[in-house]
Regions:
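N-terminal low-structure segments adjacent to metalloprotease catalytic domains
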Residues: 1-10
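Juxtacatalytic substrate-recognition/specificity segment
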Residues: 11-134, 138-142, 152-155
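An acidic- and aromatic-residue-enriched active-site/binding cleft used to recognize and process polar
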Residues: 79, 123-125, 147, 163-166, ...
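Generic structural signal for hydrophobic core residues of well-folded globular domains
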Residues: 119, 145, 149, 188-192, ...
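Post-HExxH zinc-binding segment in Zn-dependent metallohydrolases
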Residues: 131-175, 182, 187
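Beta/coil-rich, acidic/histidine-enriched accessory regions frequently appended to metallopeptidases
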Residues: 208-247
Length: 247
């Protein structure tokens, strides 16, 4: 299915593609009349750019991570399913899987999101943190990571913003908003620094949800947390975030 003969590497990632593509990702056979070509050079460029930002600026992995020993892996599937998902291989190294129709936009938003999951799971593979709080914080976190490397994410996926505006009454981490609302994470990172979100993931404990972890890390009472959330949403009314105004 996969082979080192159908592989291309950056400094930090190995990209494999399935046998159906043949040896050249730029000129594979169509599948059921659908073109399957992938711009490998753009994929390599963007993957390495995302990787370096997640590692060096967001600090989602710490020194000694297994990602220093192994390349993360990108697996391209010869399929029309339209799937993309991030995780890890054997609880050792981060990886993600995608089909060509998720790799067509030049900014590769789906790749940025799924590589975010690869880094989230890399922390766990490295023995830091647990998969706590359900999938909500993982999806919200991956959207926030995407937004860091593509400041035009809201313009690219305006449907998320439009849907969120109709659902602002729903609780933080409500499952209907997890792809739409990385704004609390933006607020926290603005107050505590970009690496704080990665540390939040590492600090998670069984029996906690992300709010409990955050309150413990910041030594906040429930009343203090409520006041902070109110302040966060006051900022959101005018999109009053330093990074957003700098774009």
């Amino acid at each position: 299915r996969y082979s080192s003969r159908r592989m291309s590497c950056t400094d930090n990632l190995a990209i494999f593609w399935e046998k159906g593509f043949g040896n050249d990702l730029a000129a594979p056979p169509d599948l059921e009349g659908h073109p399957m070509a992938v711009d490998l050079e753009n994929l390599k460029y963007q993957l390495e750019r995302f990787y370096l930002f997640y590692r060096d600026s967001l600090k989602f992995v710490k020194p000694g991570s297994q990602s220093e020993k192994y390349r993360m892996m990108s697996m391209i599937q010869y399929s029309l399913e339209g799937t993309a998902y991030g995780g890890d291989y054997d609880q050792v190294i981060g990886a993600f899987w995608a089909t060509p129709n998720r790799l067509q936009d030049k900014r590769l938003n789906a790749v940025a999101h799924e590589l975010g999951h690869s880094f989230q799971l890399q922390s766990i593979a490295d023995g830091e943190g647990v998969a706590w709080g359900g999938n909500g914080i993982f999806e919200m976190g991956a959207q926030w990571m995407l937004w860091q490397v593509n400041p035009h994410w809201i313009d690219d996926e305006t449907y998320h913003w439009d849907a969120f505006k109709k659902n602002t009454h729903k609780a933080f981490l409500h499952t209907e908003n997890i792809y739409r609302s990385p704004y609390i994470l933006e607020y926290w990172s603005e107050r505590q620094g970009l690496p704080f979100i990665g540390e939040l993931f590492r600090q998670g404990k069984k029996g906690e949800d992300p709010v409990m972890t955050y309150k413990r890390m910041q030594n906040l009472s429930q009343e203090q947390f409520n006041d902070e959330m109110f302040d966060a949403y006051q900022h959101l009314i005018n999109f009053d975030y330093k990074r957003v105004f700098s774009i």
